[in-house]
């Protein structure tokens, strides 16, 4: 319940709608509770005395009450809808804002599909708590208390028979809720898995088609979908038991009331109209209990969803800007001082171990190594996407932990392995680097990245629309746009994380020549191809998370066995053209 209470704080400006909705429900309930009294009078006075005028009068009054109950019910629906959808929007905004603050290590705690489910399905479950649950939770107790009170007022003896059944219903409700609560949590977890499979399959649909793996993906989806179906069936198998259980108990009570009431009518101590009115109250109380039972089941599922949402909102941000953090990066120098790093504190092995590396401002550094050598891990410590486990990382001579995060990351441009572009125009995507960039600055960055070659062929140029992920561009085109976007940021340090792998060697050479003109910018190039780093001031060889050697291409080619092996394999593998061209 604490999670629900906490999320209730996001209702904010919609409290007025909630209060008005509750008022409408209470007025609606009052009108409905008056009707059984009118029915009793209509039978005992109007019908018994054959008084048509009285019957018409009471019938008209009952119609007015029913109409007013309908109007107040419709008004409630309007207020509840506004409150529930507004509340849901506020929660989604809070979740999304929180996720945008996450560091990479925070994101490691959640699957992307799970975060999507928590912002959509789980929020919808909470919205249903208001849409479907607020009315009965307000109306149910009112009907229950007033119904029992009025039934005692009409006939205390019959009311006692009915009242005895209430604890039995409470026990049934408790047992069902206790059984179903953990099943709802499991159900939402399977929804996460289903979303993950769908997202993965749709995102990689081109690879699925290329490798003719459609049947395999269908089988994988069917397996998870079947799990969801079975889990849903099991959950609702127990959840729906409340209806037959309640019906058995309550209809047994009604039979007893009719038996006792019939005997009382025969003895003359009870009128037919009073018994009819009493039974109307009994049915209203039964409905109230059913409403409360359904609300408890809805609340049970909502508690599971609220807990999942709270996990997102309560996730402790691992990386935060310090108070009064340094706002300006002096230069592009980078220093690693006895740096070690592991992704999880409980991990036995370090991804990086005892790294000592000093890069002067304006230098161009190449980083090579085998798969899993921790090349990407190394550079992710510079803009503080992760914090070093041991040791110190400095940028511009200052510990990265002392910087304001926004200031640090604005000074460090990083072009990731995966080229991320968004739906919208090419211009909009490039302006991520500099929102205020004019066309002249944008085109200059595109020329440096050799993106102007294909942009000039597009009829709409910078206004060309990109689909999600930029999938209407080739891999090389996307890489060049990502490079141009990073250049627009005018960062002091520019990191290329294997970000020219999709362009041909001739284009890569052009890009390097243009980048060489940016002498005041420190450039760190992670690459698989020797030709990508052969021109750099120094080359760092990483092996199993440790610095194996540092030197120029010529030095390493003479002295280092690992570098010689990489060079020889690429000469045999068809990269010799690029390497020879660089050495000419």
What are these regions (language model features)?
Residues 1-32, 39, 47-62, 72, ...:
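Membrane-integrated ABC transporters
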Residues 24-28, 61-69, 73, 81-85, ...:
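Alpha-helical transmembrane segments of multi-pass integral membrane proteins
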Residues 13, 17-30, 41, 65, ...:
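Transmembrane helices of ABC transporter permease
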Residues 50-57, 146, 150-164, 234-308, ...:
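Helix-loop-helix
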Residues 13-16, 104-105, 121-130, 134, ...:
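An intracellular "coupling" helix at the cytosolic face of ABC transporter transmembrane type-1 domains
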Residues 49-50, 85, 93-117, 121-123, ...:
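Short intracellular "coupling" helices and adjacent cytoplasmic loop segments at the cytosolic face
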Residues 327-584:
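ABC-type nucleotide-binding domain
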Residues 35, 39, 76, 80, ...:
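Hydrophobic/aromatic residues in alpha-helical transmembrane segments
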């Amino acid at each position: 319940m604490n999670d629900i209470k906490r999320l209730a704080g996001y209702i904010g400006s919609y409290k007025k709608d909630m209060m008005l909705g509750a008022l409408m429900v209470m007025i609606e309930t009052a009108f409905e509770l008056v009707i059984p009294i009118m029915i009793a009078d209509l039978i005992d006075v109007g019908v018994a005395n054959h008084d048509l005028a009285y019957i018409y009068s009471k019938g008209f009054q009952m119609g007015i009450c029913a109409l007013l109950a309908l109007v107040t019910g419709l008004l409630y629906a309007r207020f509840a809808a506004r409150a529930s959808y507004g509340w849901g929007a506020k929660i989604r905004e809070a979740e999304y804002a929180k996720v945008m603050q996450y560091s990479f290590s925070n994101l490691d705690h959640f699957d992307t599909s799970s975060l999507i489910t928590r912002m959509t399905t789980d929020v919808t479950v909470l919205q249903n708590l208001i849409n479907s649950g607020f009315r009965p939770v307000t109306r149910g107790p009112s009907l229950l208390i007033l119904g029992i009170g009025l039934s005692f007022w009409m006939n205390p003896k019959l009311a006692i028979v009915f009242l005895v059944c209430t604890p039995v219903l409470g026990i049934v409700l408790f047992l069902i809720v206790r059984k179903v609560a953990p099943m709802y949590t499991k159900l939402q977890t399977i929804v996460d898995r289903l979303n993950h499979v769908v997202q993965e399959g749709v995102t990689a649909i081109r690879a699925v088609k290329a490798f003719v793996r459609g049947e395999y993906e269908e089988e994988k989806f069917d397996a998870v979908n079947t799990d969801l179906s079975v889990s849903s069936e099991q959950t609702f198998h127990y959840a729906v038991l409340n209806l037959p259980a309640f019906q058995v108990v309550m209809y047994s009570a009604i039979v007893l009331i009719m038996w006792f009431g019939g005997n009382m009518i025969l003895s003359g101590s009870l009128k037919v109209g009073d018994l009819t009115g009493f039974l109307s109250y009994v049915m209203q109380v039964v409905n109230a209990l059913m409403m409360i039972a359904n609300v408890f089941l809805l609340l049970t599922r909502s508690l599971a969803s609220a807990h999942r949402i709270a996990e997102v909102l309560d996730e402790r941000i691992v990386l935060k800007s310090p108070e009064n953090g340094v706002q300006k990066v002096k230069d592009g120098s980078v220093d690693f001082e006895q740096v070690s790093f592991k992704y999880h504190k409980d991990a036995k092995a370090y991804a990086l171990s005892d790294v000592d590396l000093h890069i002067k401002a304006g230098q161009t550094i190449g980083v090579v190594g085998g798969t899993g050598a921790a090349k990407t891990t190394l550079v992710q410590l510079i803009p503080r996407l992760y914090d070093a486990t041991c040791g110190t990382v400095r940028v511009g001579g200052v510990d990265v932990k002392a910087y304001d995060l926004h200031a640090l990351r604005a000074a460090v441009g990083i072009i990731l392995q995966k080229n991320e572009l968004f739906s919208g125009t090419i211009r909009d995507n490039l302006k991520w680097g500099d929102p205020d960039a004019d066309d002249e600055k944008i085109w200059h960055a595109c020329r440096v990245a050799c993106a102007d070659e294909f942009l000039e062929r597009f009829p709409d140029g910078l206004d060309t629309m990109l689909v999600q992920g930029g999938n209407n561009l080739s891999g090389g085109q996307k890489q060049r746009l990502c490079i141009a976007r990073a250049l627009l940021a005018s960062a002091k340090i520019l990191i290329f994380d294997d970000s020219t792998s999709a362009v041909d060697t001739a284009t890569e050479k052009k890009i390097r020549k243009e980048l060489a003109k940016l002498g005041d910018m420190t450039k760190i190039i992670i690459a698989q191809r020797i030709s990508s780093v052969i021109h750099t001031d120094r080359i760092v060889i990483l092996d199993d998370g440790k610095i194996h050697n540092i030197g120029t291409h010529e030095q390493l080619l003479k002295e280092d066995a690992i570098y010689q092996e990489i060079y020889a394999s690429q000469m045999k593998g068809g990269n010799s053209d690029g390497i020879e061209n660089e050495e000419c």
